[in-house]
Amino acid sequence: MKYLKRILLMVGFLTRIPVPFKIDGTEEDYGKGLVFAPVVGLLIGGILTILFYILKRFFPPGVTGILLIAAYIMLTGGLHLDGLGDTFDGIFSNRSREKMLEIMRDSRIGTNAVLAVICVVILNYALLSSIPLSGLPKALLLFPVAGRIGSLVGAGSTVYAREGEGLGKSFINCCGIKEILQGGIIYFIVSLLVLNIKGLLLAAATMITSFATVKFFAGKVGGATGDILGAVCELNQTFFLILFYLFK
């Protein structure tokens, strides 16, 4: 029951998919529950894959790609894209660490945020539109998993950057190497089942990009925040799609 509870907590927090009943979780439940973030990614990917098979019967590939991107944003509520924008606003402001963190918490949208979100969305659309239709279902199934493993790696491999409370504190303080290993096993198994040896190589590569991305951001502000976890998720999805396209 504990694991089911944590899975449902992750579904409720990381997506806009309705959970049929209210679940109260502790800080530990959220932090340890991030192990199941790849499972949530697989759920998102499964919905997108089913939607793809429906949409392709009625629309050309270009329109289908736009609708799939829109569906992804609706499924996640734009949570990770918001983190991406806030992170780029702060990190690339070229200010002090304290000022960067202050900018990231500011609800106003800056130029760097707009550019980052637009570039990632357009690049994802271009990649999805360029992948052959025969391979697209597998890409759709796995790219959200790659993104969520990025958030897990980010939470488990660094410290919380802020003093006081914040959205990502529970995840970062209660998540560690053990959770990364457990979530990584899920990621590698799913990737192997979907893409065979190629899946293992892509999983290994995107685990590495996760570590590299979070270390870059953490080096700027002294750790990670909820926004940074969202940014790593979105960037890792794009890295996965790039690699999938290159090695299609």
Swiss-Prot record:
It comes from the Bacteria. Keywords: Cell membrane, Cobalamin biosynthesis, Magnesium, Membrane, Transferase, Transmembrane, Transmembrane helix. GO terms for cellular component: plasma membrane. It is found in: Cell membrane. It is a multi-pass membrane protein. The chain crosses the membrane at residues 34-54, 58-78, 113-133, 139-159, 185-205, 227-247. The keyword Transmembrane helix applies. It is an enzyme of class 2 (transferase). It catalyses: alpha-ribazole + adenosylcob(III)inamide-GDP = adenosylcob(III)alamin + GMP + H(+); alpha-ribazole 5'-phosphate + adenosylcob(III)inamide-GDP = adenosylcob(III)alamin 5'-phosphate + GMP + H(+). GO terms for molecular function: adenosylcobinamide-GDP ribazoletransferase activity; cobalamin 5'-phosphate synthase activity. GO terms for biological process: cobalamin biosynthetic process. Its EC number is 2.7.8.26. The keyword RNA-binding does not apply. Belongs to the CobS family. NCBIfam families: cobS. This is Adenosylcobinamide-GDP ribazoletransferase. The lineage of its organism: Bacteria, Bacillati, Bacillota, Clostridia, Eubacteriales. The gene is cobS.
